[in-house]
Amino acid sequence: MVQSLELLLDEGSESALRGSWDALAAAGLPSLASHTSETNRPHVTVAAAEEGLDGALDAVRAVVAGWGLGTGGLAAVVGSPVLFGGAKQRWVLARQIVPSRPLLTLHAAVHRALSEHAPEAEVDPQTTPDGWTAHVTLSRRMPADRLAEALAVVDPEPIPFRFTGLRFWDSPSKTVTDL
């Protein structure tokens, strides 16, 4: 099971990304539209671990308090489609988040708080400052032979947006906590 810290997007960009989920599903392709849990929404994972992140929530909350996520947000841009993985000929299709100095600074600050206040958490190296590619997932387990079709369905136009919040996802309890 996994715990994660996830940046949330403004309503307009979330709607546009859900539109990509829906377009993939309408084309008969794997899509996160099929994941109908009320907690499922477009997000950018900034940290993930099997356990232990909950020990640093107060510290993370203090870090993000100064970033105005609840009052105007941090400006960012959803960029081009990107592919991850390829294990067993299955791919993750996502949209890259164009990295900016403020986003990278916030990400590093969250990880400093985690290392100081939850040192026992074994953070996934793909979410650490040295291994992170900021992205919003559109589809998991995309078959290799359908990649061209999927890329043709996804609108690649940049989407300017604002990060408006950070949440903690706890998969064992299937709960989210807004930070």
Predicted regions and their residues:
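Short, low-order "capping/linker" segments at domain edges
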Residues: 87-99, 176-179
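Basic, often amphipathic N-terminal segments
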Residues: 1-77, 102-159, 178-179
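Glycine-rich, aromatic-bearing surface loops/beta-hairpins
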Residues: 160-164, 169, 175-179
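Short, charge-rich binding segments
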Residues: 67, 85-86
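Sequence-level motif detector for i,i+2 pairs with an aromatic at +2
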Residues: 71-73, 90, 163
